[in-house]
Amino acid sequence: MSEEKSYCGFVAIVGRPNVGKSTLLNKLLGQKISITSRKAQTTRHRIVGIHTEGPYQAIYVDTPGLHMEEKRAINRLMNKAASSSIGDVELVIFVVEGTRWTQDDEMVLNKLRDAKAPVILAVNKVDNVQEKADLLPHLQFLASQMNFLDIVPISAETGTNVDTIAAIVRKHLPEAIHHFPEDYITDRSQRFMASEIIREKLMRFLGAELPYSVTVEIERFVSNERGGYDINGLILVEREGQKKMVIGNKGAKIKTIGIEARKDMQEMFEAPVHLELWVKVKSGWADDERALRSLGYVDDL
């Protein structure tokens, strides 16, 4: 009896910041892997999400948003990570937002014109478009920009047409052995996922108050005798004022962040979590490439 064929390949998800790439990845995987937040520029690492369904294994590369501004070291590195994700993939999903088209979208498009892989255009947040009459002409405009494999209007938030994207992905996976066991959903360590969860909560609860000069180091991640994990997280900010902001009045803010992060960790790790958080000022880290390397920002470049 002949063995069943298997299919496996890499799929890059690209687009300018804040168009819904991480939400789309989470929806395609059926669970939360990449951090989502209303702030642009929240994805800093190329998180690999793995989705295995029968003979098909799609390995998703979730890029940081490619963006025009490259002044700070962290932004240069994020752009470099996003650009290097476009090479060596079987398929690219280019995510744009509703009827908006910006210079940043144009820049991503220009990079994709050189890509060898076919490109699916996912027009996200179509449910938010107020003037529905504007949608068709905009889709026609997009279709004229390059030869897309397909153009799919989606809502990553509600899941509308995400299955259509998944079906196109399956169709274009080459015949190959699976790279990962079928129960894998990401190749990132639990320590890394813990830091991402804390960072998401910082973005969520501090919103526009806090600039991007915040990162999280996991200083301790150990199993305990209760069958759970003891995790110590260090939140690094650039200025004393930001430290006060993260801690909040009488520690209220950091307490909320800790409670919410712990809930998500327990759900992800399927085990009890004891989480402790500290805040420390480390000035200039977002401008210093050496500091970024020490924080693991360039481990995959």
Swiss-Prot record:
Q: Subcellular localization, per the record?
A: Cytoplasm; Cell inner membrane
Enumerate the residue ranges of region (G5). 154-156
List, alphabetically, the Gene3D superfamilies matched: 3.30.300.20, P-loop containing nucleotide triphosphate hydrolases
Renumbered residue ranges of the record's region G2: 41-45
Q: Please, which domain of life does this record's source organism belong to?
A: Bacteria
Q: Would you name any one GO CC term?
A: plasma membrane
Q: Which residues bind GTP per the record?
A: 15-22, 62-66, 124-127
Carries keyword Cell membrane?
A: yes
Q: Which InterPro entries match?
A: G_ERA_dom, GTP-bd, GTPase_Era-like, KH_dom-like_a/b, KH_dom_type_2, KH_sf_prok-type, P-loop_NTPase, Small_GTP-bd
Q: Where is this region: G3?
A: 62-65
Which stretches of sequence are listed as region G1? Answer: 15-22
Occurrences of domain KH type-2 (ranges): 206-283
GO MF terms held by the record: GTP binding; GTPase activity; ribosomal small subunit binding; small ribosomal subunit rRNA binding
Q: What does this protein do?
A: An essential GTPase that binds both GDP and GTP, with rapid nucleotide exchange. Plays a role in 16S rRNA processing and 30S ribosomal subunit biogenesis and possibly also in cell cycle regulation and energy metabolism.
What's the family?
A: Belongs to the TRAFAC class TrmE-Era-EngA-EngB-Septin-like GTPase superfamily. Era GTPase family.
Q: How does it assemble?
A: Monomer.
Record-given protein name: GTPase Era
